[in-house]
């Protein structure tokens, strides 16, 4: 399965949606 993960930080001006497979650590996916 693949999940859509939204990273939101108003203070940092970040609003990103990433695809994250269920066998990948979310921090590893966020680094890519």
From Swiss-Prot:
One term of GO molecular function: 2 iron, 2 sulfur cluster binding
Entry's cofactor comment: Binds 1 [2Fe-2S] cluster.
Domain 2Fe-2S ferredoxin-type, residue spans: 3-32
Major subcellular location class: plastid
Disulfide bonds: none
Keyword Calcium included in the entry's annotation: no
Keyword terms: 2Fe-2S, Chloroplast, Electron transport, Iron, Iron-sulfur, Metal-binding, Plastid, Transport
Keyword Electron transport recorded: yes
Swiss-Prot/TrEMBL cofactor(s): [2Fe-2S] cluster
Cellular component terms (Gene Ontology): chloroplast
Location relative to the cell: Plastid, Chloroplast
Assigned protein family: Belongs to the 2Fe2S plant-type ferredoxin family.
Its job: Ferredoxins are iron-sulfur proteins that transfer electrons in a wide variety of metabolic reactions.
Annotated protein name in UniProt: Ferredoxin
Source organism per UniProt: Porphyridium purpureum
Lineage, highest ranks first: Eukaryota, Rhodophyta, Bangiophyceae, Porphyridiales, Porphyridiaceae
